[in-house]
């Protein structure tokens, strides 16, 4: 009996092994078929690349963007400029003869900075360049004049908490990388308020400064007093730190006319090329249309928005129609935490099984180096093959972890996601500053970015099967 049981167990294990082996063989065969399918797009990919980089569409995304930002300017959430920008894009997309163009209403924060200034009163008089941080409250009309404490970290602030009461906290945090250093912009006011400070000034989150403050959104916490907060230049933060190290008394007068208005009406702007075979299934290409209220918002995120529009234009110009719908979404309210995209997700998540791939470009359109991808290993293997279609421009690398505030909800829910990976070595020089203008952009780089964006989105949208998830 014991021998029989062992024999049956052995046969069962053998069956399992054979089943796994056969499954692996089937998977390998299927993947080889997918590779063959992807390889069949070489001519189409070359046509897209030729049109975008060398043909009639050369420099088009750059020229469209230049006209847009020169005409509209920056596009702060809730502002009249953003309304103008959305109307401009709605009209332009209609004129591009795409299949569907429509607006989806959302609510967005409406904050205005108003007049603002900072004056060093002691140990000498000097005007300090500032940019109020998004969501900040204002000061009284007469401003706030207070002694300053300079710290280089949250840990130092907490260790010196008794010194901070009634003072303005100046953070002179070193730039490590954006993800690490931006914590001071986001939470600096809250941490300062917890120890009794009356305002906070944050060293701009940038590795390079030419006396230019960089703004950005910050967040208050319930049950913590709200205090005014602004960014200052790297140069002034370092000067104040040197003064403090010499034991000098530092006094600053801060005036901010910032106002938080009720949420405003806005729209996500959407355009589509409807799929020929599976129109209910969708590949999304996207960038955000809003920007900060300084500079032109050409880099952040005009470039990403306009290469996403260019993807649909190139496909239309070549007379192509993918099997799935290719959907352009120009998000609103991204700079306030992706509020437009969050509302889009809530509205459309019931159709999540039909969202094949979400793509977002929001970290510049400099020289493209490849794509970042988040998804199952099987999907990654397919995307690796798709990237090989870009060999004519030598941009074939696929990196881990797609990035994008506006597509995070989809990726967290299991939808494959992709983002443009480009040379961002200079990105944070201009980020959220007056320097974010059309001068940052390069038409050759934008052509290449558009080619990458279009080839990937079209091929994924046209393949017979959706990406595994």
Swiss-Prot record:
Keywords: Carboxypeptidase, Endoplasmic reticulum, Glycoprotein, Golgi apparatus, Hydrolase, Lysosome, Metal-binding, Metalloprotease, Protease, Secreted, Signal, Zinc, Zymogen
GO molecular function: carboxypeptidase activity; metal ion binding; metallodipeptidase activity; protein homodimerization activity
Compartments reported by the entry: Endoplasmic reticulum; Golgi apparatus; Lysosome; Secreted
Secretion signal span: 1-19
Active-site annotation: 334
Binding residues for Zn(2+) 2: 300, 335, 432
Top-level taxonomic group: Eukaryota
Binding-site residues for Zn(2+) 1, renumbered to this chain: 288, 300, 362
Alphabetical list of CDD domains matching this protein: M28_Pgcp_like
Enzyme class: hydrolase
Residues modified by glycosylation: 59, 159, 351, 394
Residues of the propeptide: 20-42
Enzyme Commission identifier(s): 3.4.17.-
SUPFAM superfamilies the UniProt entry points to: Zn-dependent exopeptidases
A GO BP entry: proteolysis
Assigned GO CC terms: cytoplasm; endoplasmic reticulum; extracellular space; Golgi apparatus; lysosome
Alphabetical list of Pfam families matching this protein: Peptidase_M28
Transmembrane segments: none
Record's keyword annotation contains Manganese: no
Keyword presence, Endoplasmic reticulum: yes
Function comment: Carboxypeptidase that may play an important role in the hydrolysis of circulating peptides. Catalyzes more efficiently the hydrolysis of dipeptides with unsubstituted terminals into amino acids.
Family per similarity comment: Belongs to the peptidase M28 family.
Complexes and interactors: Homodimer. The monomeric form is inactive while the homodimer is active.
Protein name: Carboxypeptidase Q
Organism in which the protein naturally occurs: Xenopus laevis
Source lineage: Eukaryota, Metazoa, Chordata, Craniata, Vertebrata
């Amino acid at each position: 009996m014991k021998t029989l049981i062992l024999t049956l167990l052995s046969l069962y294990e053998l069956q399992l092994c054979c089943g796994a082996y056969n499954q692996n063989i089937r998977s390998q065969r299927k993947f080889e078929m997918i590779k063959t399918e992807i390889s069949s797009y070489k001519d189409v990919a070359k046509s897209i690349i030729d049109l975008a980089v060398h043909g009639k569409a050369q420099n088009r995304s750059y020229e469209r963007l230049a006209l847009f930002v020169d005409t509209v300017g920056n596009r702060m959430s809730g502002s009249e400029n953003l309304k103008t920008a959305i109307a401009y894009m709605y009209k332009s997309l209609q004129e591009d003869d795409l299949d569907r163009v429509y607006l989806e209403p959302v609510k967005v924060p409406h904050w205005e900075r108003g007049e603002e200034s900072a004056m060093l009163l002691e140990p000498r008089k000097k005007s300090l360049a500032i940019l109020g941080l998004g969501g900040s409250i204002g000061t009284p009309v007469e401003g706030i004049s207070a002694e300053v404490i300079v710290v280089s970290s949250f840990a130092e602030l907490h260790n010196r908490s008794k010194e901070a009461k009634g003072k303005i906290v100046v953070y002179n945090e070193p730039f490590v990388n954006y993800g690490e250093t931006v914590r001071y912009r986001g939470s600096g006011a809250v941490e300062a308020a917890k120890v009794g400070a009356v305002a906070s000034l944050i060293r701009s989150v940038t590795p390079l400064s030419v006396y230019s403050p960089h703004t950005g959104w910050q967040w208050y916490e319930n049950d913590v007093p709200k205090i005014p907060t602004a960014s200052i230049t790297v140069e002034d933060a370092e000067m104040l730190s040197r003064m403090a190290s010499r034991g000098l008394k530092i006094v600053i007068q801060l005036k901010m006319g910032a106002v938080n208005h009720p949420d405003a009406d806005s729209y996500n702007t959407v355009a589509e090329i409807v799929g020929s075979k599976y129109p209910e299934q969708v590949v999304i290409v996207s960038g955000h249309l809003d920007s900060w209220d300084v500079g032109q918002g050409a880099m952040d995120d005009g470039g990403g928005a306009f290469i996403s529009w260019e993807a649909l234009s190139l496909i239309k110009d070549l007379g192509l129609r993918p099997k799935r719908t290719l959907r352009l979404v120009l998000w609103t309210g991204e700079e306030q935490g992706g509020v437009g995209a969050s509302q889009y997700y809530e509205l459309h998540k019931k159709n999540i099984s039909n969202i094949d791939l979400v793509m977002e470009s929001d970290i510049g359109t400099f020289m493209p180096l490849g794509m970042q991808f988040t998804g199952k290993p099987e999907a990654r293997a397919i995307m690796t093959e798709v990237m090989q279609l870009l060999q004519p421009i030598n941009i074939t690398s696929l990196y881990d972890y797609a990035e994008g505030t506006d597509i995070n909800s989809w990726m967290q829910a299991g939808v494959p996601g992709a983002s443009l990976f480009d040379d961002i070595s200079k990105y944070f020089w201009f980020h959220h500053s007056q320097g974010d203008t059309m001068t940052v952009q390069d038409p050759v780089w934008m052509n290449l970015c558009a080619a990458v964006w279009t080839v990937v989105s079209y091929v994924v949208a046209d393949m017979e099967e959706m990406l595994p998830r």
